[in-house]
Amino acid sequence: IGIGVPSIVDSEKGIVYNVANISSWKEIRLKEILENEFNVAVAINNDSNCFALGESLYGEGKPYDNMVGVTIGTGIGAGVIIGRRLYGGQFMGAGEIGSFPYLDADFERYCSSFFFKRHDTTGAAAAENARQGEQAALDIWKEFGMHLGNLVKVILFAYAPQAIVLGGGIVAAYPFFKDAMEYTMQSFPYRVMLDNVRVIASHQNDSSLLGASALLE
């Protein structure tokens, strides 16, 4: 059993810490619990790490030695691939980019579903309204793209990848925020790095599942 969880993890011991969406999960020995229950091997990692691993092995990241997979949904996180191997850092927390300070809060408040709550809407509603040509919705996506472009620049500074693969539910609306994101990226100071990185929207729905299964290989 391979599992991705939205939190930091002791991957060797299979301990899950501080799951944001499950407040009672402060320090859960999930690997031990599941192995005792099902009598099979269990591997646990951060969910964004699983996404990045899946994309690196089977998806848009496959051509690249060094890439970052970014999941955009109820929150935002990243998995880092260096030399075609997952780099998790201590407690698999290397890609917790949503917690980077930004403006009056952090990037998660501006580059995930939290952003749309600020505009009294949802990503799905904003996408549907944008498809209908509603200017207010198009403006919301333009602003979202600007914030995401600023986060991409941070990723370039931190990891200098060859590719950044975007995944998660919000990426279905990629055409509405792509231009604003790319425009904002143009202020990155190292032109040679900017010219040699690809930002790609994932077309796979099962990258995280594939990455979680690969934890056992």
Predicted features, each with a name:
Residues I1, V9-I15, K31-V42, E55-Y64, ...:
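ATP-binding/phosphotransfer module of carbohydrate and carboxylate kinases, centering on a glycine-rich
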